[in-house]
C-alpha cells in the first residue's frame, strides 16, 4: 500500500491500535495526519512527538467525539486545508463497556438487563461511525476528482483512498 505523500486521518489516535497505526503511517512518510481522540492530553503529546521528530507540522490533533458529525466535518475541512485531500482513514476509535448481558442481583434475585443506551453508544462508536468516517473520505475524494475535471475512475489510476 502506498502511504508516502498521502494524507491520513486516524481516530482513537491517543492510545492502543490508533496510536501505533498513526506512528507507523508517519514512519511510512504520510504527508500529513489528523490525530483524533477524546483524550486531549495524550493526543497533544503524540502530535508534539510526531511534529518534533518530523521538524514540521505533520500531525494535527483534534480532540472530540467521533460520533459528532460537525466534528468529523471540521477534522476533514481543516486537514484538507492544511495538507490536501485525505486519502487514508483509520477509524480505530473504540469503546468497551463490558458486563454480562443479563445479571441476577444476588440480594433481590431480579434480572438486570444490559442498558440499551450503553449498547447503542458502543454500536455508535465501534460500528456505525467508522463507516461514516470512511464515507466522508470517499465523498471528499469524489469532490476533489470532479473539481480536477476527472469523471470515471480508471483502473490505471490505482487506489484513490484506503480504509484501514
Cite the ranges covered by each PLM segment.
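Flexible N-terminal pre-Rossmann segment of NAD(P)-dependent oxidoreductases
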Residues: 1-9, 27, 110-112, 148-159
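Canonical Rossmann dinucleotide-binding motif of NAD(H)/NADP(H)-dependent dehydrogenases/reductases
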Residues: 2-34
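Rossmann-fold scaffold of SDR-type NAD(P)-dependent oxidoreductases
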Residues: 11, 86-97, 102-103, 126, ...
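Conserved glycine-rich Rossmann-like NAD(P)H-binding loop of the short-chain dehydrogenase/reductase
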Residues: 29-45
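The beta1-alpha1 cofactor-binding region of Rossmann-like NAD(H)/NADP(H)-dependent oxidoreductases
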Residues: 40-41, 63-74, 116
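Conserved catalytic-site loops of classical short-chain dehydrogenases/reductases
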Residues: 87-88, 97, 120, 147-164
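Catalytic Tyr-X3-Lys loop
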Residues: 95, 108-134
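Amphipathic alpha-helical dimer-interface segment in Rossmann-like NAD(P)H-dependent oxidoreductases
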Residues: 124-157
Amino acid at each position: 500500500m502506498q502511504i508516502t505523500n498521502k494524507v491520513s486521518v486516524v481516530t482513537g489516535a491517543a492510545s492502543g491500535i490508533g496510536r501505533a497505526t498513526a506512528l507507523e503511517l508517519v514512519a511510512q512518510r504520510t504527508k500529513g495526519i489528523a490525530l483524533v481522540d477524546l483524550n486531549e492530553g495524550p493526543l497533544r503529546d503524540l502530535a508534539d512527538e510526531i511534529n518534533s521528530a518530523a521538524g514540521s507540522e505533520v500531525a494535527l490533533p483534534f480532540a472530540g467525539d467521533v460520533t459528532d458529525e460537525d466534528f468529523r466535518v471540521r477534522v476533514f475541512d481543516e486537514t484538507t486545508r492544511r495538507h490536501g485531500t485525505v486519502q487514508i482513514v483509520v477509524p480505530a476509535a473504540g469503546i468497551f463497556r463490558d458486563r454480562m448481558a443479563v445479571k441476577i442481583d444476588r440480594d433481590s434475585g431480579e434480572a438486570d438487563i444490559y442498558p440499551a443506551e450503553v449498547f447503542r453508544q458502543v454500536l455508535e462508536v465501534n460500528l456505525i461511525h467508522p463507516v461514516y468516517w470512511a464515507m466522508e473520505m470517499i465523498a471528499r475524494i469524489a469532490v476533489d476528482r470532479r473539481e480536477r475535471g476527472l469523471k470515471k475512475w480508471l483502473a490505471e489510476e490505482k487506489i484513490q483512498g484506503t480504509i484501514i
